[in-house]
C-alpha cells in the first residue's frame, strides 16, 4: 500500500474531536504551587477506613447504600437518584440520553462552568449560548429566542465562577417555558454552602427538571469522583440505559456511603460553617487591598474578584506557589480571578502576596 495515501491516526478521528479544546482542569493547567486555590476543593483531607473487601467481585451499578443514604440526605426517593463518576458524568449522560447528535442542541448561559460545552462538543451535539445579563442573571428573552431545537438546558446555581444564585422566579419561568420540550438541569455542585436554595423540592412539580450534585466540594471528596443526578424516575430510567455497567468502584462506593451517614452529613455541615467564616475573613481583607477593584458576593466556597493588572497579579502569585483560577477569557469577566476559600494560613498567604503587589 502506498504510504502517500496513508492517513495519520489523528486524521482517522472524528472531525469534532480533532477540533475539540479539552477542558482546562485545575490539574491539567499544572503549576508547582503549594497553595492550591484554583479548583474549589476543600482544603484539608477527611479520613475514612474501607469496610468492603470484596475487590474480587464487580461492584453494583447503583450501590444500594449510596443511593439510599443520598436520597435520605437530599429529601427524595431512592428511585429519583443516580450515582455517577462525578457530576461531570451526569452532564454527559443527559446529553447522550436526550440529544440527537447533528440535529439537536444544548443551551447554557456564560459565564459559567465549562464542561457543558466540552461534553456536548465531544458527543457532536450543537452548543448554544445566551450570555447572562449584567448582574449574571438569566436573559429569559434571549433564551426564549434560542430554544427551538434545544433538548437540554444547563443552569448552574450557585453559578461557577461568579458565585451568585440564580433568581428562583426566573428558574420557574424557565421551567414553564421549556415544559414538554426540553430538560432543564440545575447544577447544584455548591448547594451545600446555601442549602436553602436547592431545587430538589421542585421535582414533584416539574417532570423535566434535573438536579446535579457532587461530593467533591463540601463533602471534601474531590478525589473520590462521585456525583449524583436527582430527577423523576422516568428520567433516571433513561439514564440507566446509557451509564456504564460499573460506574463506581467498590472503594468509592464504600467511602461515599460512609460520608452520607447522619454522622458524615453533620461533619460536612461543620466544615461548611468553617468555610463560611473563612470566606468572610478573606472577603473583608480583599476589599482593603489596593490591587483589588471589586469583590463580588458569593454563596459558595470561592470568591470572584476583579483586579488591576490581573494577568500580572495571577503570574506573580503563581511564581510564589499560590495558584488561583484566571477567568479573563470568560464573557464579562475581564480582569477577574477566582479564589478558592482555603485554610486561614492559605488565606493569609494570598492576602500578604496581594498586599505586596505594586499597582
Curated annotation (Swiss-Prot):
| SUPFAM superfamilies found in the cross-reference section | PLP-dependent transferases
> Which reaction(s) does the protein catalyse, per the Swiss-Prot or TrEMBL entry?
L-histidinol phosphate + 2-oxoglutarate = 3-(imidazol-4-yl)-2-oxopropyl phosphate + L-glutamate
Which top EC class applies here?
A: transferase
Which cysteines are cross-linked by disulfides? none
A GO BP annotation: L-histidine biosynthetic process
Alphabetical list of Pfam families matching this protein: Aminotran_1_2
Could you tell me one molecular function GO term of this UniProt entry?
Answer: histidinol-phosphate transaminase activity
Write down the EC number.
Answer: 2.6.1.9
| Residues found modified as N6-(pyridoxal phosphate)lysine | 217
Listed pathway(s): Amino-acid biosynthesis; L-histidine biosynthesis; L-histidine from 5-phospho-alpha-D-ribose 1-diphosphate: step 7/9
Q: What InterPro entries does the database record attribute to this sequence?
A: Aminotrans_II_pyridoxalP_BS, Aminotransferase_I/II_large, HisP_aminotrans, PyrdxlP-dep_Trfase, PyrdxlP-dep_Trfase_major, PyrdxlP-dep_Trfase_small
Key word Transferase present = yes
User: Highest taxon of the source?
Assistant: Bacteria
Alphabetical list of CDD domains matching this protein:
AAT_like
Keywords linked to the UniProt accession: Amino-acid biosynthesis, Aminotransferase, Histidine biosynthesis, Pyridoxal phosphate, Transferase
| Swiss-Prot/TrEMBL cofactor(s) | pyridoxal 5'-phosphate
Q: Please name the HAMAP family in this protein's record.
A: HisC_aminotrans_2 (MF_01023)
* Subunit and partners: Homodimer.
Q: Which PANTHER family match?
A: HISTIDINOL-PHOSPHATE AMINOTRANSFERASE, HISTIDINOL-PHOSPHATE AMINOTRANSFERASE-RELATED
Q: Member of which family?
A: Belongs to the class-II pyridoxal-phosphate-dependent aminotransferase family. Histidinol-phosphate aminotransferase subfamily.
Q: What is this protein called?
A: Histidinol-phosphate aminotransferase
Source species: Citrobacter koseri (strain ATCC BAA-895 / CDC 4225-83 / SGSC4696)
Amino acid at each position: 500500500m502506498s504510504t502517500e495515501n496513508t492517513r495519520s491516526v489523528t486524521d482517522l478521528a472524528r472531525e469534532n474531536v480533532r477540533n475539540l479544546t479539552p477542558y482546562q482542569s485545575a490539574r491539567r493547567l499544572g503549576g508547582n504551587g503549594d497553595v492550591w486555590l484554583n479548583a474549589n476543593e476543600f482544603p484539608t483531607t477527611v479520613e475514612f477506613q474501607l469496610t468492603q473487601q470484596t475487590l474480587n467481585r464487580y461492584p453494583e451499578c447503583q450501590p444500594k447504600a449510596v443511593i439510599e443514604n443520598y436520597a435520605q440526605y437530599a429529601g427524595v426517593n431512592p428511585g429519583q437518584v443516580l450515582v455517577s463518576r462525578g457530576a461531570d458524568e451526569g452532564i454527559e449522560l443527559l446529553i447522550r440520553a436526550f440529544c440527537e447528535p447533528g440535529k439537536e442542541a444544548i443551551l447554557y448561559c456564560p459565564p459559567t462552568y465549562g464542561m457543558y460545552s466540552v461534553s456536548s462538543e465531544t458527543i457532536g451535539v450543537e452548543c448554544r449560548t445566551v450570555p447572562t445579563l449584567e448582574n449574571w442573571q438569566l436573559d429569559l428573552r434571549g433564551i426564549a429566542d434560542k430554544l427551538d431545537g434545544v433538548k437540554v438546558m444547563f443552569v448552574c446555581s450557585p453559578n461557577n465562577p461568579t458565585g451568585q444564585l440564580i433568581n428562583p422566579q426566573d428558574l420557574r419561568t424557565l421551567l414553564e417555558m421549556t415544559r414538554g420540550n426540553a430538560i432543564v438541569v440545575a447544577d447544584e455542585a455548591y448547594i451545600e454552602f446555601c442549602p436553602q436554595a436547592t431545587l430538589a423540592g421542585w421535582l414533584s412539580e416539574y417532570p423535566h427538571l434535573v438536579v446535579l450534585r457532587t461530593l467533591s466540594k463540601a463533602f471534601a471528596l474531590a478525589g473520590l469522583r462521585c456525583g449524583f443526578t436527582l430527577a423523576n424516575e422516568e428520567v433516571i430510567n433513561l439514564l440507566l440505559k446509557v451509564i456504564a455497567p460499573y460506574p463506581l468502584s467498590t472503594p468509592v462506593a464504600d467511602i461515599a456511603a460512609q460520608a452520607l451517614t447522619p454522622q458524615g452529613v453533620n461533619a460536612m455541615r461543620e466544615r461548611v460553617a468553617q468555610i463560611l467564616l473563612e470566606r468572610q475573613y478573606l472577603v473583608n481583607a480583599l476589599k482593603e487591598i489596593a490591587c483589588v477593584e471589586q469583590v463580588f458576593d458569593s454563596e459558595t466556597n470561592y470568591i470572584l474578584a476583579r483586579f488591576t493588572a490581573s494577568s500580572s497579579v495571577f503570574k506573580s502569585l503563581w511564581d510564589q506557589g499560590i495558584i488561583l483560577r484566571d477567568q479573563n477569557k470568560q464573557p464579562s469577566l475581564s480582569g477577574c480571578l477566582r479564589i478558592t476559600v482555603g485554610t486561614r494560613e492559605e488565606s493569609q498567604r494570598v492576602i500578604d502576596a496581594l498586599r505586596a503587589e505594586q499597582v
